[in-house]
């Protein structure tokens, strides 16, 4: 059963049945670089993640292909949670991220108590930057976070973005 659907794209509640696809996505180096996180968990530990802690965690399905193409999840911040997105490697650069993000925000703002959603990405992640712009996120430079790159050990900055309910519907 889908939480929300539009044309051929649908979002369903994430379950542990989705863990294997998500785990494979985390094995992808580009995924790890996109999150500045070297992923080295074994599958059995990954499957023990308490998915009920998160207010919104969905699997993205292309209904025409009858395939899972990615995942979106809200972080745990109670006021401005971060919306994270993972499009599986074989489905990238096909517009799924933009469409799924818009659909997720529509659902979140209609059904959850948030007035603003945050997002972040790194300046070298051109696809995510383009997606955030297309969806309507605005830069929030005052919220940028300096970090150490987990791959190069050089300084980097996670760029901060946000979108309000009014901005999405405006």
Language model segments and positions:
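Acyl-donor (CoA/ACP) binding surface of acyl/acetyltransferases
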Residues: 1-28, 60-170
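A short helix-loop-beta-strand connector motif used in the catalytic cores of GNAT acetyltransferases and
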Residues: 48-61, 70
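Conserved GNAT-fold acetyl-CoA-binding loop/helix
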Residues: 27-48
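Short linear motifs in intrinsically disordered
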Residues: 15-17, 47-50
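Juxtamembrane/interface motifs at transmembrane-helix termini
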Residues: 41-45, 54, 88-91
């Amino acid at each position: 059963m889908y939480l929300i659907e539009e044309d051929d794209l649908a979002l369903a509640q994430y379950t542990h049945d989705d863990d294997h696809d998500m785990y494979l996505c985390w094995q992808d180096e580009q995924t790890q670089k996109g999150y500045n996180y070297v992923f080295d968990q074994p599958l059995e530990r990954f499957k023990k993640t308490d998915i009920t802690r998160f207010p919104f965690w969905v699997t993205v399905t292309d209904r025409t292909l009858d395939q899972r193409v990615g995942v979106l999840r809200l972080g745990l911040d109670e006021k401005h949670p971060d919306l994270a997105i993972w499009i599986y490697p074989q489905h990238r650069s096909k517009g799924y991220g933009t469409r799924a993000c818009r659909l997720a925000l529509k659902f979140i703002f209609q059904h959850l108590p948030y007035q603003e959603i945050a997002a972040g990405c790194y300046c070298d992640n051109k696809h995510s930057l383009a997606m955030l712009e297309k969806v309507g996120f605005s830069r929030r430079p005052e919220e940028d976070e300096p970090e150490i790159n987990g791959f190069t050990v050089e300084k980097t900055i996670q760029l901060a973005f946000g979108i309000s309910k009014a901005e999405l519907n405006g």
